[in-house]
C-alpha cells in the first residue's frame, strides 16, 4: 500500500505546524538503509517516523529501532505497518524533549523540515556515533559548506567540528507526500573523537557569526584582551573549523582562569 493510501485509509490530516512531509518512495528508503549498512547488533534512532516508509525498511535489517513520532494520529498507520516486527519501539513524543536516547546509537532519519537546526544540535548532544539524515537541499549545502562559501556558517561549523560529513545523494521533491517546494539531500555524518563542551562551544560559534559580515574584532569586542596578538581582521566565514576550535579554546581557558 502506498503512503498516500495509508493516509486516506485512516483519515490522517497533515499538520502544517509540524512541517509534515512524508517519504513515499520505497526505493529511496531502501537506498538510505543500504548506505547505513546496519547489523542486528546496532541500535537505530529514527526522528520523525511519519507514515513509516523508512521505519519499515530499518526494521527489516534486524537492528533495534527506536522510532520517535510527535503526531499520535499516525499511530494506526505505524502499528499496521510495523506490528509484525518485534525489533521496533515506537515512542510518541517530541524528540527534542527526549530524556533517554541511547548514547552511541546510529541516527537514520528524514529530518522534519521545520526543526532541522535544533534536531542537528540534538544529534550532536546525544553523541550519535553516526547519522544518515535527509534534509532540505539548502540545509545540506550549509552542513557541507567549506570556509569562504556563502552557505558556510554556524551550522557548518558545529556539525563539522563533531562529525566527518559527506554528501550521499539528492532526493527529488516528487518522492514525498505532499510534494515540498524544494528537493532534499541525504548526508552521512561520522562522529569524530572530539571532547568539547557543546553548550559552551555553540555559544562561542553563535557569537563569532552573530554579524556575519563583520570581522572577528567586531564580534568579539567584549573579549579583545583575551585575543591579544591574534589576527582578528578576518570574518568568521573565512576561518576553518580547526581555526575556530583554536579560538574557542583560547576563549574558554581565559574565562575559566578569570573565574578562578
From Swiss-Prot:
EC number, UniProt record: 2.1.1.182
Gene3D superfamilies referenced in this protein's UniProt entry, alphabetically: Ribosomal RNA adenine dimethylase-like, domain 2 (1.10.8.100), Vaccinia Virus protein VP39 (3.40.50.150)
Pfam families: RrnaAD
Catalytic activity: adenosine(1518)/adenosine(1519) in 16S rRNA + 4 S-adenosyl-L-methionine = N(6)-dimethyladenosine(1518)/N(6)-dimethyladenosine(1519) in 16S rRNA + 4 S-adenosyl-L-homocysteine + 4 H(+)
SUPFAM superfamilies: S-adenosyl-L-methionine-dependent methyltransferases
Domain of life: Bacteria
Signal peptide: none
One GO MF term attached to the UniProt entry: RNA binding
Broad enzyme group: transferase
Family: Belongs to the class I-like SAM-binding methyltransferase superfamily. rRNA adenine N(6)-methyltransferase family. RsmA subfamily.
Protein's job: Specifically dimethylates two adjacent adenosines (A1518 and A1519) in the loop of a conserved hairpin near the 3'-end of 16S rRNA in the 30S particle. May play a critical role in biogenesis of 30S subunits.
NCBIfam families per record: ksgA
Annotated protein name in UniProt: Ribosomal RNA small subunit methyltransferase A
Organism: Thermotoga sp. (strain RQ2)
Gene this protein is translated from: rsmA
Amino acid at each position: 500500500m502506498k503512503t498516500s493510501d495509508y493516509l486516506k485509509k485512516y483519515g490522517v490530516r497533515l499538520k502544517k505546524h509540524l512541517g509534515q512531509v512524508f517519504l513515499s518512495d520505497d526505493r529511496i528508503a531502501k537506498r538510505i538503509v543500504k548506505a547505513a549498512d546496519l547489523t542486528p547488533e546496532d541500535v537505530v534512532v529514527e526522528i520523525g517516523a511519519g507514515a513509516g516508509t523508512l521505519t519499515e525498511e530499518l526494521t527489516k535489517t534486524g537492528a533495534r529501532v527506536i522510532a520517535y513520532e510527535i503526531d499520535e494520529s499516525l499511530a494506526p498507520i505505524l502499528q499496521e505497518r510495523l506490528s509484525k516486527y518485534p525489533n521496533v519501539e515506537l515512542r510518541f513524543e517530541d524528540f527534542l524533549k527526549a530524556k533517554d536516547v541511547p548514547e552511541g546509537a546510529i541516527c537514520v532519519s528524514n529530518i522534519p523540515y521545520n526543526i532541522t537546526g535544533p534536531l542537528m544540535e540534538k544529534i550532536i548532544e546525544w553523541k550519535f556515533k553516526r547519522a544518515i539524515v535527509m534534509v532540505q537541499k539548502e540545509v545540506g549545502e550549509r552542513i557541507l559548506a567549506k570556509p569562504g562559501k556563502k552557505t558556510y556558517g554556524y551550522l557548518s561549523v558545529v556539525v563539522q567540528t563533531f562529525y566527518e560529513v559527506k554528501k550521499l545523494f539528492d532526493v527529488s521533491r516528487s518522492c514525498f507526500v505532499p510534494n515540498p517546494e524544494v528537493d532534499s539531500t541525504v548526508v552521512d555524518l561520522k562522529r569524530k573523537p572530539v571532547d568539547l563542551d557543546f553548550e559552551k562551544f555553540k555559544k562561542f560559534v553563535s557569537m563569532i557569526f552573530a554579524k556575519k559580515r563583520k570581522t572577528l574584532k567586531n564580534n568579539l569586542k567584549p573579549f579583545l584582551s583575551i585575543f591579544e596578538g591574534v589576527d582578528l581582521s578576518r570574518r568568521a566565514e573565512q576561518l576553518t573549523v580547526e581555526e575556530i576550535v583554536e579560538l574557542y579554546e583560547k576563549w574558554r581557558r581565559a574565562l575559566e582562569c578569570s573565574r578562578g
